[in-house]
Amino acid sequence: VMFGPDGNNLLPAQVLYKKNILALRGSFRPVTKVNMDMFERAKELFFSEKKVDPENSQIIFEITLSNLRAEGEINERDFLDRAELLCSLGQNVMITNFQEYFKLVEYFSEFTKARMGLAMGVYNLIQIFDEKYYRHLSGGILEAFGKLFYRDLKVYMYPYRDEEKNEFITSENLKVHPRMKELYKFFKNNGKLIDISDFDQEIFHIFSRKVLKMISEGEEGWQEMLPEGVAETIVKKRLFGYSKSRIKT
């Protein structure tokens, strides 16, 4: 399912045909300033590529149902609320059933042979290099990586701040499983993994799950962690467990 900024259904075949595609996967529960910083920085890098014409490109915020299942029973209203907030920020939103990134890329490849980009945080990149996600494939992780990186694809990696070491984790100091080291180095050295370096260091304390907890428990302060206009919509429509009666005084 795909929605445009106006909230109306879109046909992926029409929207994505022969387009350059940049996709951001997340739970967006709710969308935070960190999500939008990743979006802005990845978009700058993607559009700076010689092969990418911004006029012939689509950016998609993707929510996968497999993540929703991990949170328990799928609540249709909940993920439609997430999509609505993203649409209100002027974005295209796609709800898919693809757990693995290579399946998402294969799907996009049905519509285009142009450049593709995936923007993601460190945690998601670590998952890509985790063999357990590919045990169902006869060729294992190598088959998945062939399907993922064989295409004209780049991954834009948003850093993570390690609070204990007080350092940012990037593709340079990221630790992957010893068996994956050479594979990781191969894709990094071939320019498939690009670090997002021009990021906002002031917002790294913001996590969607923390915001969600603050909303549901009636704590103050979560509003400042969200993009402009999002908090007002959450309050107005009482999304994510928000209730005026539960606000602490």
Q: What are the language-model segments listed below?
A:
Residues 1-249:
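Nucleotidyltransferase catalytic core that binds NTPs
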